[in-house]
Amino acid sequence: MGYEVRIWQKDETPAFDAFDEFEPDIFMGQSYHLDEALFKCIQHRPHMKVVLRGSDWGDIQKDIDLDKYPILVASKEEKKLLERLKEETGKPDFVHNHYHENWIKHTHNKWEDIGIKPFSLIHGADVFEFGLRPPVDVLKCDIGFVGGYWPYKAKCLDKYLIKLCHPVGDYNIKIFGNRNWPVVQYMGSIASENVGSLFASATVSPNISEPHSQDFGYDIIERPFKVLMSGGFCISDYVESMANDVFINNEIVFAKTPEEFKKLIDFYIKNPDERIKHMKAGYESVVENHTYFDRVASILTELNLPEEAAKCINVKMSLFGAEE
């Protein structure tokens, strides 16, 4: 597409050096990384468009126990510095987060109080890393899962996935990840280029969210997009926004309880052809609406760069056999 992109390793290169060396037209960062040095770099470049991933700051936080649910929320210092940045520079152009637009008005509405628009930018799929592929014999299994295991996430993993690991042998389960899982089905790490092959080879690729996603319903993780883009079949725990806002056409089968999750696993292992309609709907949905080409196009549209946004979509369409 003709863009030059530089990833700034902020802990290795000072802000002034990074910006002087590259002189970006668009800067994308995080609201919680704003400091005085970055402030000045933005201030000295009035032509530069600025997009920041914004921490949660909205009415919904008053109902959430942040000791129980470690959600990233905006700090007092972060709010003050962003308010000053907006007053003095008019930046950022907007903040975004990966919640659907039906929810971001509740999770991020306080940003509007300081003149900053919150923008929905849900996760998607990388079409170069994930895509249709044949099953791989050594990765074939009843249940295939890639992810980490730590105490907070274990609150859900234990009920949905770990429970199925016992007795050993009831299911052919392959678990990969960068942390040690407390089960013999854990097979260590997996190369990133093989993750999509696991999703394509497993009978079921489950999606299991963290406690706040299940309990509050708005945080949709990236895994289901990867599974569907790879042509895999996904059974997911129930996350309200994922079921009602994003995957609303039978792309994913949802289970509201661990018991229902197990029943669905058993049904689709015994009846694998019943997966096909969901796999087809899932792949088509992601290709049409949920690739990272679509997400970049959304950013460029919001920045009032419609011609650049159209280029993104045309590149996507050319990859899938058509062009707008």
Model region roles, listed by residue range:
Residues 42-44:
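Short amphipathic alpha-helix used as the core "switch/output" element in two-component signaling
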Residues 1-22, 30-40, 54-57, 63, ...:
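Nucleotide-sugar donor-binding catalytic core of glycosyltransferases
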Residues 262-324:
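C-terminal amphipathic helix plus adjacent low-complexity
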Residues 46-51:
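Short beta-strand/loop segments at the ligand-binding rim of alpha/beta enzyme cores
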Residues 24-25, 257, 291:
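Short, electropositive alpha-helical surface patch
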